[in-house]
Amino acid sequence: MSNSIIKVKKSGFYQDKTKLNLAGSHTWNTVQSIAGKKVSLDALTGNFTRLWTIETKGFVLGNKFYGSNLSGLAKVNVVPWKKDGRLNKQFYSQFEKVVKRAEKRDIVVGVCLFDNAWISYMDRGWEFHPFNGLGPSDPSEVHSKGPWNTFQRAHVKKMVKTLEPYNNVIFEVGNELHRNSVSSFQKNVVKWVKKFTDKPIGVSYASRVKPSAGRTQSWIAKTNADWAAPAGGERIPGFKGHYVFDTDHASALRTNVAGLQAANRRGDSLWLMDGLGGDILKNASNLAPDRAYINSIL
């Protein structure tokens, strides 16, 4: 990889003044193992992947979404915090190893700092979250203003400082954070990242904050984020950064080549949510055409 950090213009991501056509697939367990299973970078498609931070130590999938090969309680091997809110050093060491391997393969990684989906959508997810008992009354409060933000800021600082030596890194505030996050939390995380590093930071769709749910995504324009991945590829009035089309927020686990093609014509970066073999969650349809399309534009 280059010795220069990645920068963002409205037209895309750049490194050494050269535009990077970032397109690739991502899945949940590339950093953390879930039920003892971890996915190798070699199983993914393209020159980019999104690295998830799952916050809970366990959950039950059952028949969620399109099914899973897992049954019973699925345990996550390591998360950012211990039960008392202190940082778990093993998590950051494990994360860094994956980023380093990606760098050797010329893969850019989008580091997703927080997540709401696994504590809000999955059975028993909140039960095993480190903050359960440390302040928030339920998942809807985890990514909102509260004393526990001290633990979250420490996590952001540790992640940014750990990954500062690597120039294949961009950051993302969080995956489908609760709508309570859009008033202050997401803006604050953007501020924290910008204080600690010059690497880009983006925001993405907040859970059920989209036009089809009767809510506007205009909050995105107020975050000072460098890039954004709104639901469905929507254009946000007043947002001046680069757009990403992440199928996780448009057609998650379903084939959508037409959507990828349209986003590519708009100049968006293309990120594909892929359940692969279904060890965690199954794809609803065959994503081979979507993977092939991504490979065809690189």
PLM regions: where:
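Low-complexity, Pro/Thr/Ser/Gly/Ala-rich linker/spacer regions in secreted
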Residues: 1-3, 298
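Active-site mouth of glycoside hydrolases
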Residues: 3-217, 222-225
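Catalytic-core region of carbohydrate-active enzymes that cleave or remodel glycosidic bonds
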Residues: 200, 218-297
